[in-house]
Amino acid sequence: MKIVEVKHPLVKHKLGLMRETDISTKRFRELASEVGSLLTYEATADLETEKVTIEGWNGPVEVDQIKGKKITVVPILRAGLGMMEGVLENVPSARISVVGMYRNEETLEPVPYFQKLVSNIDERMALIVDPMLATGGSVIATIDLLKKAGCSSIKVLVLVAAPEGIAALEKAHPDVELYTASIDQGLNEHGYIIPGLGDAGDKIFGTK
């Protein structure tokens, strides 16, 4: 499995700000979107381009444009919505597919409760967005849904990832790609990432 830890100084700086315990909801939400945008930049670096002739200010000019690769952004509800706008800044024409998952706090297993995928998802590259890759359960279950619907080109974008979640994802879906702003220390006894970000969903939606 391709694993990319994005170590750009801007990513490191913004993620560091997000780790502050008393960060405001507004600021956390802004930073989640900004880091999501930077991760998208990395995740789409291999998109093919083609030469197209357009009408410029001084006549015809040859430019590069993305070659036919359609994209769907797949936020995992609810926290994934906090990264979605940043992703769309880079790929504004992407379609949105939504998957609802929550984690059973006793078993730590994902529980699906909603899904609405674009009709031609089998023709698109899916960018799954979720702030945290902890045990990996929610992301793995989401990939299961996408593959069942015919999607074969899948990339996962997360703010922070635990080694345990990475290992589980690689075992279940070695053909996907993972892009993260940080590979953190690991999980505590409650299944939360250390040092992590706390509850990203609560911080994004102001329910902490």
Swiss-Prot record:
It comes from Escherichia fergusonii (strain ATCC 35469 / DSM 13698 / CCUG 18766 / IAM 14443 / JCM 21226 / LMG 7866 / NBRC 102419 / NCTC 12128 / CDC 0568-73). 5-phospho-alpha-D-ribose 1-diphosphate binds at residues 78, 103, 130-138, 199. One of its GO terms (biological process) is uracil salvage. The lineage of its organism: Bacteria, Pseudomonadati, Pseudomonadota, Gammaproteobacteria, Enterobacterales. Belongs to the UPRTase family. Its EC number is 2.4.2.9. Keywords: Allosteric enzyme, Glycosyltransferase, GTP-binding, Magnesium, Nucleotide-binding, Transferase. Pfam families: UPRTase. Catalyzes the conversion of uracil and 5-phospho-alpha-D-ribose 1-diphosphate (PRPP) to UMP and diphosphate. Uracil binds at residues 193, 198-200. Pathway: Pyrimidine metabolism; UMP biosynthesis via salvage pathway; UMP from uracil: step 1/1. It comes from the Bacteria. NCBIfam families: PRK00129.1, upp. The keyword Transcription does not apply. GO terms for molecular function: GTP binding; magnesium ion binding; uracil phosphoribosyltransferase activity. Allosterically activated by GTP. Binds 1 Mg(2+) ion per subunit. The magnesium is bound as Mg-PRPP. It catalyses: UMP + diphosphate = 5-phospho-alpha-D-ribose 1-diphosphate + uracil. The gene is upp. This is Uracil phosphoribosyltransferase. Its cofactor is Mg(2+). InterPro entries: PRibTrfase_dom (IPR000836), PRTase-like (IPR029057), Upp_B (IPR034332), UPRTase/APRTase (IPR050054), Ura_phspho_trans (IPR005765).
